[in-house]
Amino acid sequence: MKKTAISLMLAALLPAMNAYAEQGDWVVRLRATNISPNESSDLGKYVNKNVANVMSNGAELKLDNNTIPELDISYYWTKNIATELILALGSKHDVSVAKEPGSVVPNQKLGSIDALPPTLTVQWHFNPDQTFDPYVGAGINATFMLDRTLTLNQSSVGALQGSKIKIDRDSFGPALQAGLDVNLKDGWLLNADVKYLWIDTDVKLRNPLAGNSWTKIDSLDVNPWVISLGIGKRF
């Protein structure tokens, strides 16, 4: 009788147990994602060399952070191996000219750009049949510059003031990823995820000193950290 009661209790608990990953599963996640550029820029050096000596050599381009909604879809080839496609909406970033570190001169805004950064990664899940499932991943990122025109509006640049600047090309590069799924009941899960994306592009100026031809004024590495928190559903 006692064994029967225990069996009935276990059977009653089974439907409430957490759902874990299996081969052939699809997972859809909705996350809040912060994109934090880790940029590297030599704007001042390029402008002074290629256009005119009107900037400090330490001047550089800076992009601000942005938080956006992000949808991703994963497919499990095995219970450990999954492919994830990140479908973030366009991310808008203000672009400014910054002086040398420690300068009292404030950053001077040039405008904003919109970037669309879909990313495809292959993941290894360490504990797919447990509540806490950490994973790592690697893949490729494609960043498409949707709104890429800026204006050099500083009076200190003389004849270059008012000149148009453009982000010249889209970017394709590697991506690394680490994260954690917390498996809940009925296929639901919580997710925390960190990515590092290699994004590089050229920046050009419509040069009034050279017949308004486009002149390269920077080789910009954006290289953002992408940090996400959200929920997901397994199907």
Residue positions per predicted region:
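Transmembrane beta-strand segments of Gram-negative outer membrane beta-barrel proteins
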Residues: 22-36
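Short, structured loop/turn "capping" segments at alpha-beta junctions
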Residues: 129-134, 149
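Bacterial N-terminal signal peptides
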Residues: 7-15
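Extracellular/periplasm-exposed beta-strand and loop segments of Gram-negative cell-envelope proteins
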Residues: 36-67, 88-117, 143-171, 199-226
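Positively charged n-region of N-terminal signal peptides that target proteins for export
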Residues: 1-5
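Repeated loop/turn-to-beta-strand initiation elements of outer-membrane beta-barrel proteins
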Residues: 80-83, 130-132, 188-190
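Residues on the lipid-exposed face of transmembrane beta-strands in outer-membrane beta-barrel proteins
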Residues: 30, 71-75, 85, 120-124, ...
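Sec/Tat signal peptide C-region and signal peptidase I cleavage site
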Residues: 17-21
